[in-house]
């Protein structure tokens, strides 16, 4: 597209002249838009109608390459209410403008997000979208963030901690007392940390820092803190500066720089050393959370693996930090999940379970309870979980305070349910909260906001989207795995961005839900467990005892319920893919690319790991379709002898060695998904040294630098993708070191950007920075917290009560399922007049 806009440009100002210049063609186009009555049109429909409206190819090309083509190509959707067409134009990630065009006279009017949403509502509910009805429930969280600094450039989205550091530096330039107060409040189990009450002014603190820095500079760098601890205390300095003279000197110098001339770099450096996080609580409530025999159970998958790896990394980082801070403290991490008495052979009925390969981390399971206090024995779908969450938060709070012997320093939620409970807990205890979505259901189901009534009986999206909004806006910081998760790409909004302005007609209109330019957004990409996924070249670590099993999986010639097909020519490299069998993962697409590309078939074999092999064994409609399609493609392209299809595998350890065995063949990993939010299998494959081809739609496009550390493929162009894979293997035949070069480059990319150690460092730095930010932003936060508390009490509670609960059966008495002490429900607050008017129709309050 030849035309672009600066952010200062307004589409509403520029569009009238553009319409005037192409008046004849655009009147025809807009007549086509409104000819079918009211409807919601997507970008491609708009472009198709434009194409049909202009007969002359030269005129059509000129239009598409001009300003109007830019606007329509940038439109995500348009609400057609004859004679008007309202456009939602996304000029860049996070940057939207709403305009309305009259189809007869082509007049243009700028719209607020709220006005656009009213038009959209009228498509499904005339009464709800009525312009003269101001009593409809409209929520505008952005109105409470006007004093909060925001990022301004799309390229800066996801770098919130950097902006917060800059803003804190600016505030401390004028007044350093808040930092002094923060340091004076630091303690652990009753012991003061870093400074004591002697240093009750900034001048005294700066003097003490100067004295201490000069003193430790004269010591041997390795001198233990205990040898000068008494001297520090005389100056008002307590433990926590470091374990040696050298580390103390660095921390003292960093704080001195912050106090003398605050700047973001020194601010971040200093807060990365502050001893403020010792205990962490992580909520992951739904499904069967455990360490064995749970993968493949309902609602149980990658989130469990993510959290267990996350915990190990966080504990390692905490132990290292505590040692470097010179403290004799023990970190504690609790993963809060649901205790399920009917555990189906898992350990989900065990209350407290140590996490393997950790020293101080445990899974704590707390049961769901009915209104009369009975333990709910059976599993509950993540879509039906909402009536139990408030009571769960209350019961969890009691257990957490008991086991940790105090408040946690950091609470992290996962998915909608975990994030909501984390919000309830942190609001009550006044501690720092981080949020991880994993998946936002609103983006999985097209138009699920305006069609929520059709889906609510099955998915209860009214509860889910409300809970998501509460958690996003309560949280101090939000952790995303990729930029695209937050703000998408040039063409497609991100998962969070789709919650900027949306409506659920008859329920609630979000004039501003969440703004991706909010500084709470940060990117911390997970890694793969490097004890499981390590390079194939590390021969001494290879799991050779698994090789007979893997040999059978890959090369045996018999078909059974574990694998079908065989590889006739074992000398050829293997291209390998492993994923669920559903349409979005596009495994059948890869098989079709392979079947259609003779050159690729001559160069390599294909191995697929995913799904079931027999459609009669699956209960998932989409998987059944994909299984049947796989069989059809194998027959259609006569792939027997060139393909091996292996049933989905859940043994991570064996899967790690399987990646390495594929690397032994000088093969490659292919991830062909139509869209992939992150791409953990891409990380796993690259960790094992496999050159990797991955979709350019989603997270893998950020993980891989194209043709440097791997290859991007377009899942919508199978010929181009398969040719790119074939070109690689052809080049490997001609250049004997090319395969090793790409393998090494992939590993280098992982070590620089995608390890759990890097992740843990980022998350704990966020906890420290946003923990201080809470104290600086306290007054501004308070108004929003009152708003959110009201919204929870008056909206979410009502919705949760409408979700049917399971038949209540008495649980078998077990020690771990004993009823906990019940915290009384908080009374509903009085609503201020401003909010009372906002909610009067929904709540009946006057």
Curated annotation (Swiss-Prot):
Region (GT-B glycosyltransferase): 276-755
InterPro entries attached to this UniProt entry: Glyco_trans_1, Sucrose_synth_GT-B1, Sucrose_synthase_pln/cyn, SUS_EPBD, SUS_N
Entry's Gene Ontology BP terms: sucrose metabolic process
Alphabetical list of Pfam families matching this protein: Glycos_transf_1, GT-B_Sucrose_synth, SUS_EPBD, SUS_N
EC number(s) on file: 2.4.1.13
Xref: Gene3D superfamilies: 1.20.120.1230, 3.10.450.330, Glycogen Phosphorylase B (3.40.50.2000)
Keywords: Glycosyltransferase, Transferase
Reactions it catalyzes: an NDP-alpha-D-glucose + D-fructose = a ribonucleoside 5'-diphosphate + sucrose + H(+)
Single annotated GO MF: sucrose synthase activity
Coiled coil (UniProt feature): none
Family: Belongs to the glycosyltransferase 1 family. Plant sucrose synthase subfamily.
Role description: Sucrose-cleaving enzyme that provides UDP-glucose and fructose for various metabolic pathways.
Protein name from the UniProt record: Sucrose synthase 6
Organism annotation: Oryza sativa subsp. japonica (Rice)
Lineage: Eukaryota, Viridiplantae, Streptophyta, Embryophyta, Tracheophyta
Name of the gene: SUS6
